């Protein structure tokens, strides 16, 4: 479920009518994940803060020794802040200046998210701010990075190449191939100037050097050119995505195409084994996924990069 209706939403969460996990079902999934060696758990949506048991979920995850990252649109964060103070990290969504953010995400969301950022800072929580880059928000990239520098947090980005809704009026939101690659070059320039951009250099270069038009966002094993220098994907090998309806995917970008099993029906282990055996997706240019794949693949530079970011967050809270 979600309390917003962002124009580019991949899940159409605000219109979904599925039954979410019960607390008992979630605890069973968490127990199974722990048994498989899980140490990091990201809670995302939809909007998790619509639930009344978010604190109980976080407490159960922390009690099982897991690092907990929570993704929120920020609207309910000020009133639910006491429920999330024990997470290890937060991700709050903001797409740009008020006009462009509210065009993408709904009227009034900019002011609400700025209030969420304010209270996260007051509580000394470790958080990043995430922006989806659309035709409207690419003009605000420097603004977002400047604000992150002033307010002492990291700015994260993802790319929208085409709208993921059927609404005809939203079809102009996606970036062209040229706009996307040029924006990655701009982010590299800003990182070089010291702006706190979470997205890692190799991830940004991976978009610039993508061997196909960016309308082709994912590659199966037999589609990767022999001389291509792409980031190896570890989604579906060391990391999976479980939807609110229980279906388990290699990653959320495949929820419209992968033949998934449901953890409520077959359990996490069998659903994970099915992913390992049948997933054929090997590379993409998605920013968050490739930042993760560098870490999971043992990139020493990414380990150092993340250790620095995590250490800054620890000192912020102390």
Which residues does each predicted region cover?
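Flexible mid-to-C-terminal extensions adjoining Fe-S/redox cofactors in radical SAM and related proteins
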Residues: 227-234, 245-318
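Residues that line or immediately flank small-molecule/substrate-binding pockets and catalytic motifs
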Residues: 13, 45, 94, 159, ...
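Conserved alpha-helical substructure of the radical SAM core
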Residues: 1-83, 306, 318
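Radical SAM enzyme [4Fe-4S]-AdoMet core and its adjacent flexible, acidic
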Residues: 21, 64-67, 88-89, 93-95, ...
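N-terminal pre-core extensions flanking Radical SAM catalytic domains
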Residues: 1-13, 17, 31-35, 204-228, ...
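A short, histidine- and acid-enriched strand-loop-helix "catalytic/donor-clamping" loop
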Residues: 78, 99-100
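Short loop/turn motifs at secondary-structure junctions
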Residues: 5, 37-38, 86, 151-154, ...
């Amino acid at each position: 479920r979600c309390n917003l209706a962002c124009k580019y939403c991949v899940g159409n969460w605000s219109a979904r009518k599925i039954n979410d996990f019960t607390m008992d079902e979630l605890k069973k999934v968490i127990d199974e994940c722990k048994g498989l060696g899980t140490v990091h758990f990201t809670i995302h949506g939809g909007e998790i803060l619509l639930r009344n048991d978010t604190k109980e979920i976080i407490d159960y995850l922390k009690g099982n020794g897991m690092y907990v990252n929570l993704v929120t649109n920020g609207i309910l964060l000020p009133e639910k802040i006491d429920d999330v103070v024990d997470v290890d990290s937060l991700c709050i969504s903001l797409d740009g200046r008020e006009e462009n953010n509210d065009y993408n995400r709904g009227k009034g969301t900019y002011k609400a998210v700025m209030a969420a950022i304010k209270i996260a800072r007051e509580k000394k929580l470790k958080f990043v701010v995430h922006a989806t880059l659309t035709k409207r928000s690419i003009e605000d990239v420097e603004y977002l990075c400047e604000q992150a520098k002033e307010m002492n947090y990291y700015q994260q980005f993802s790319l929208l190449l085409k709208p993921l809704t059927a609404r005809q009026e939203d079809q102009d939101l996606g970036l062209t191939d040229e706009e996307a690659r040029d924006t990655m070059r701009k982010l590299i320039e800003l990182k070089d100037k010291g702006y706190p951009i979470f997205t890692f250099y190799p991830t940004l270069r991976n978009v610039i050097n993508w061997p196909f038009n960016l309308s082709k966002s994912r590659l199966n094993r037999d589609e990767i050119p022999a001389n291509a220098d792409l980031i190896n994907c570890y989604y579906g090998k060391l990391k999976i995505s479980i939807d609110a309806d229980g279906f388990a995917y290699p990653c959320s970008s495949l929820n419209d195409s992968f033949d998934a099993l449901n953890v409520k029906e077959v359990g996490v282990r069998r659903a994970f084994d099915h992913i390992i055996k049948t997933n054929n997706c090997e590379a993409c240019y998605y920013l968050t996924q490739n930042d993760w794949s560098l870490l999971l693949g043992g990139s020493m530079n990414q380990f150092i990069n993340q250790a620095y970011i995590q250490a800054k967050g620890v000192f912020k809270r102390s």
